[in-house]
């Protein structure tokens, strides 16, 4: 949204909105701005969630491989039996197999194809902390 649009919604002037945004950026509350692109527009028809459990001694190499494969669009290091949970965007099942083959020599994987995302990426509530 433009500063003018934000000002109208918030009931503030555009310069006031601009100043508040600048202060939030300086404090690190706002870390940046992004564009929301639909991966399907670039041929990425499938998304998968991959649980990854590195083989003994392979943790660092698995992490390097995940970072090196750009189709992995998100990855979290987690507690539990698996070490990583990652999101992957691919154009086909064949591409999925090819990419997973690079990981499967270093780790056990469990893959689920995403059918639908009822909750899109969103922020948690921003209100005051409840006791």
Give the residues covered by each predicted segment.
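A compositional/biophysical signature of low hydrophobicity enriched in polar/charged and small residues
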Residues: 1-131
